[in-house]
Each structure stands twice: as C-alpha cells, then as structure tokens.
Amino acid sequence: MRAAGTLLAFCCLVLSTTGGPSPDTCSQDLNSRVKPGFPKTIKTNDPGVLQAARYSVEKFNNCTNDMFLFKESRITRALVQIVKGLKYMLEVEIGRTTCKKNQHLRLDDCDFQTNHTLKQTLSCYSEVWVVPWLQHFEVPVLRCH
C-alpha cells in the first residue's frame, strides 16, 4: 500500500512540474473527424451514403412480393460508423416505380408511379455494412413502414 501511495505522489509531482500532456496532443484527439466506434452524421448526398441507400433498396426489392420495383426518393438522415469497414445507418424514403420486377431495368431509369392507386411511399431505416477492400456489403437491418 505504501508503494502505491509513493507512486501516486511521484506521478502527481511529475504532472504538476511538466504541466501534464501538451494541449496540442489533446486538441488533436478532440478535433478528429471520425472516431472508430462512434457514429457520426454524414451528408445525405455523400457517394457512400447514396450507394448504401441503393443497397438497402435492392434488398427491399428482393424481399418483397410487389410486382413493381421501389427506389430511394429521399435520404432524410445518414450516420456512418467505422467498424471493420463502414456501417451506414440511414433513414430513407422509398417509392414505387413504374418498372416491373421482371423487366430487369436499371433503377435510375425507372420513374416513380404517378397513378394514385399504384403510388406508394415508405419510410425505411436501414443499416448497411460496407467493407470496401473486400468489395463486400451487407444489409443486416431493414425496416420499412
């Protein structure tokens, strides 16, 4: 116990005489833009966000029995987190298009439904995990209502 008290006193003495860690060291850490493990708000028009939103829509289209394809109409919120790749957390509005699933068209070429009986918009929350160096993506969470 006495050795621990001596060590504590020595550390306090050193820090008080040296002034502790330099302010530059602390400010570099605090000013870091993205810290591993912490979600950070990102612009909704960021290319990575747009691609992650498209992955979400593709998963939605593959999981539903709707005869028409949906595509993203608006990304309302986007977060990114560094976790063995990038994890995007997105709030996206998706809309039914005029393209039928069996037509295999590019989603960018599909217009949104204007027919009131066929028009449908859903709000979705998705998490998309992207590992760029492995060209791997996964959509573990997708909820639409």
UniProtKB/Swiss-Prot annotation:
> Which cysteines link up through disulfide bonds?
C99-C110, C124-C144
Keyword Secreted tagged: yes
Per the annotation, which location comes first and is thus the protein's main one?
Answer: secreted
- Compartment(s): Secreted; Cytoplasm
Keywords of the record, alphabetical order, are: Cytoplasm, Disulfide bond, Glycoprotein, Protease inhibitor, Secreted, Signal, Thiol protease inhibitor
Site, Reactive site: residue positions? G37
> Which top-level group of life is the source organism from?
Eukaryota
What GO biological process terms does the UniProt entry carry, in alphabetical order?
immune response; lysosomal protein catabolic process; negative regulation of microglial cell activation; positive regulation of myelination; regulation of antigen processing and presentation
The listed location of motif Secondary area of contact is 81-85
InterPro entries cross-referenced by the UniProt entry: Cystatin-F, Cystatin_dom, Cystatin_sf
Picking any one GO molecular function of the record gives: protease binding
**Family stated for the protein in its record:** Belongs to the cystatin family.
Role: Inhibits papain and cathepsin L but with affinities lower than other cystatins. May play a role in immune regulation through inhibition of a unique target in the hematopoietic system.
Q: Subunit notes for this chain? A: Homodimer; disulfide-linked.
Recorded protein name is Cystatin-F
Protein's organism: Homo sapiens (Human)
